[in-house]
Swiss-Prot record:
Gene from which this protein is expressed: htpX
Listed cofactors: Zn(2+)
Name this polypeptide is given: Protease HtpX
Cysteine disulfide links: none
Cofactor note: Binds 1 zinc ion per subunit.
Highest classification ranks of the organism: Bacteria, Pseudomonadati, Pseudomonadota, Gammaproteobacteria, Legionellales
UniProt KW keywords: Cell inner membrane, Cell membrane, Hydrolase, Membrane, Metal-binding, Metalloprotease, Protease, Stress response, Transmembrane, Transmembrane helix, Zinc
One BP term from GO: proteolysis
EC class name: hydrolase
Membrane topology summary: Multi-pass membrane protein
Amino acid sequence: MINNLKTFILLASLTALLVVIGGLLGGSTGMLIALVFAGVMNFSAYWYSDVLVLKMYNAEPLPNNHFVNNIISELAHRAGTPVPKVYLINNSTPNAFATGRNPENASIAVTTGLLDRLTQEEITGVLAHELAHVIHRDTLINVVSATIAGAISGIANMFMWLSMFGHNSNNEEGVHPVVGMIMMIVAPLAAGLIQMAISRSREFEADAGGARISGNPQWLASALLKLDQANHEQYFDEAETHPSTAHLFIINPLNGEKLANLFSTHPSTAERVARLRAMY
């Protein structure tokens, strides 16, 4: 209950940040437009964001007879929840995410790299983790926050260019270029910090829930160590192109050498593994 309240407050903060940007850009009219825009974004995110995220990563449905579908069916039956659809992303970097507005409309995407690098037990641990996200309804929260954060980043960049080239500082309807520059930097950072606060506690809960579903926390712990190492060594092109979706993944897919990674939406892998190993 407390975690749900915290998440509601953080999502409201993202929406408020979008409205503030609208106010700076266009006064009271801009605030109204931003508020309407936020409503449309939330509505669209609820109904369509899962489809959009899967398209971003060119995910394709797995054949019904694929062994991964057999694993997820068994896990879902064990957890007493509908069986999610499983999609494959053609990328050698091992990773996975879940999406969808509710358990009845959920999907799990895995990369070819994950299937190539992990053992069947480790794959089971990862799928159980993602299924726990679905059961906890984290999937809806994640895609909504990703959609709003992406909109904030896009508007902030547009804000900067409009303030620099579309108006001058003597125009009372314009925004001073310095304000635009500050907004470009601060708004996406603030959105990222809010996303981080939403995501971190939910990752721990999904780890624990997934371990209970699979019956062996060591499977997920072993998988996390392999995924963490690979995602520091490899470059996930689609994730770098769409950084606002990074928090959807089981392991942060953004390159570890980037400064932005200091504000990771994921808790440290070492802490996650330690908690899993302490479960039994």
